[in-house]
Amino acid sequence: MYKRQVLLTVGHPASVAILNKLPYDPVKDFGMVSTIVTYPMVVSVSKDSPIKTFAELISKAKANPGQTSFSSIGTGSLHHLLGEWINIEAGVDMLHIPFKGAPQAFNEIMGGRVDTMIETATFSFGQIKGGKLRGLAVSSASRSPIMPDIPAVSETLPGIEFSSWLGVVVAPGTPRPIVDKLNREFRLMLESTEFKQKFSDFGGTPIASSPEEMRSRIEQEISRWRRVVDIKHIERQ
């Protein structure tokens, strides 16, 4: 297999939206090969929270502008941007409270000091299965096959569909035959039961794409997050 490959994460488009200057072009300086896995973000609350559904969360936020809170792992993080996107589409003003990481946010949720948590499926699904969190919604286009009882955000707010992802890139200008060969190899790899199980263990679903589909995903996410940053006046770094 071609050895000069690197993983690109869903944080790439978000960093483009939140940073003032980049020393590279976020699209042209990467040779897209394929996405390899997607996994949803999860909106959840403590098991003891009176909020039972995502619709109830939105209703509470509408009734209490600026008082219903959501956590993230930092200003400008995907967690933060997703929460603000929900604010925009729902017409609410949930208060953003940033933390240094998921464990700190989790402690505040469990202590009742923050209303809702926006976190990766990797972290959230384990806490939901363990009975500590109640999943209100997943951000993916449809329900996760891993936890199908949790509704999608779009069931309440049509239009909000977002999945975290990992993808493979090579140097720009890599010959197309090499890119196509890599794409075929990753597609075969992702069809294996072993890889499907490994990804499932952290809330992910293996999904390959064409180089063009991966590029389009990145361009769309850059545009979306820039819009969120502009509308919510999030300070660029």
What residues fall within each predicted segment?
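Conserved helix-loop-beta element of the AMP-binding
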Residues: 31, 57, 132-144, 162
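Hydrophobic residues within well-ordered alpha-helices
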Residues: 83, 109-110, 128-131, 182
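N-terminal (or domain-start) structured segment
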Residues: 1-28, 67, 91-120, 127, ...
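Short, charged, surface-exposed secondary-structure boundary motifs
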Residues: 105-108, 145-149
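An extracytoplasmic/periplasmic, membrane-proximal ligand-sensing/linker region
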Residues: 88, 129, 176-237
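Hinge/capping helix and adjacent helix->loop/strand transition within the periplasmic-binding protein
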Residues: 3-4, 17-104, 153, 158, ...
